[in-house]
Amino acid sequence: VVLFGRVHGGRTGFALGPEPVQLGRDVGDERHIQLDDPLVSRRHAEIHWSEIHSRYWIRDLGSRNGVYLDGVRIAREVIACGDLLRIGDTVFRFTAIEPGAPEPGAPEPALEPPFIGRSRSLRRSLELAARIAPSDTPVLILGPTGTGKDLLAAAIHRASQRSGALVPVNCAALPSNLVESELFGHERGAFSGADASRAGLFRAAQAGTLFLDEIGELAPEIQAKLLRVLEARSIRPIGAVAEALIDVRVVAATNRDLGHEVAHGRFRADLYARLTESVVQLDPLRDRPEDLAPLWDHFVAQLGPRARLELSGAAFEAMALHAWPFNVRELRQLVRAALLARPGGGQLGIDDLPPAMQRPRQGRPGAKADAKPDGPPTPPLLLAGGEVPSPRQLRQLVEEFHGNVKDIAAFLGKDRKQIYRWLRRDRIDPDAYRRGSG
């Protein structure tokens, strides 16, 4: 699959067979891959099938600028599924062809707002979302922080054609002593300080959709009440005698593994079963590099419409090999930082990227094991209000910053006390990660 670059005829994918395939600027017939790239030699590289190894191999045909596999220059190497190949300024990804999978360039599902990307993974998620949108069943959106779960919830609501509003709520940001009142409402005098009645978020979403983001943060007693609402389609505000019927579609989202939470008694199995009637998975950005180039172009047009900010092949390759712990939000932040550094536009090389993106992937022969630089992994990244990093993300940041809580707080745009609260929550000791410890 072509991720980045200029392929003759605008082709976006090539099916490999048993016959050798050459790549270059002048390779003849259509079974070969012709690249309109001045950095590519006339006959640059060849991919061939080995009957002995039952694997594809690639070899450099004596090119001027080399062949790179997962960021490392090679002469001859086995190709594995998921590997990135760079020749000049053109980057490919080797993928297995799945039966029934949408082809690159296939029409995207009709959802508003439209999602930016062309990976099969994203397209499958959008197709599923479009199919289940007209129903009234609960939907659970799974995916790590920054993948656009809130945007998908909004798209499902619009496609449902429900007449009411979409009411979003971040469960992690609700005060623990007010969650029930916020969701279900209360009557005047129901508790100390209840000087007036409150309708609650469920009634605010009447005939519409209630989006419960970070649902894994809800306490067990609230989970039980939520389950009853889903089953009875009615609510009882705090202090009320009678129940009120509601017509609300619930869309929930989480970056947690709720199956794991159920197994450890932190999430109700019956609520989990109810929510998983319809599940849409949004994969992390690191697993769908096909979406990087269109997302980059989208953010450049959005944030710097008068700037022409382009990427070199080496810079794109480094981005495709990056782990993207904060996903699409991190990419947007990278574009913003690049536009600030180059307001007039131009081409970004690999040296213009954050240090963590410049090191080669570990494990490929020839990669430098000691290439991890000091400093933050990306430009400063601000979390949205109420957003909470997952334990894995927090541990990764503690490792990157060698246990320096002050630097982590600056990186996330949060107070140090909040970082310490998260560390205690996830039982992470920053001292264990400081230089010279243990």
Task: Please tell me what each predicted stretch does.
Residues 128-193, 203-219, 284-289, 334, ...:
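Conserved post-Walker A coupling segment in P-loop NTPases
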